[in-house]
Amino acid sequence: MLQIDGSHRFARGWDTHLVQRLHDCEAGKNAVLTGALPGFTSADTTDPHSETHFYAATPKPATQVKWSEEGLPLFSPREVEVNADKLSRPIETMAASSHFTFSHGNLAKVASHDPSFDNAFAWEELWMTYTYWKNGFTLYAPVDNHDPFAFYIQPGMNE
């Protein structure tokens, strides 16, 4: 099951790539792939055929960087710096990313988004992380040495 947030572009074969990465995770049916995706820029973001530049990188796992004034943990993507070239399978990560999650279909049955939330934008990733953890899921970042499979346009990248 794929969940995405915002404008994405996918590389050919993204689905088979993610299925293989999901099967590489030790948590089995309770594995969730997630991470901050590499970016892309496009001459015209409304035209999927416009000239596009994709940044070569793997998804980044999250790390807790500071605390909000309300006492909530704030997460930020980070590069894997030590032995990144030797990774051959996804690694565990501490937080979900709203850029994407990919999992077996049981995630939607057990830990789906709560439809009663009017606006979860500011704390969506924290809620996802807690809900998945509470229901026995393990988060993994597919940071292994493979070609990028998806790209995310972030606000301000085309300005």
Annotate each predicted stretch with a short phrase.
Residues 2-4, 8-113, 151-158:
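Conserved catalytic core of nucleotide-sugar-dependent glycosyltransferases
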Residues 137-159:
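Active-site-adjacent helix/loop segment of glycosyltransferases
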Residues 18, 107, 118-144:
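A short, conserved alpha-helix in the catalytic core of glycosyltransferases
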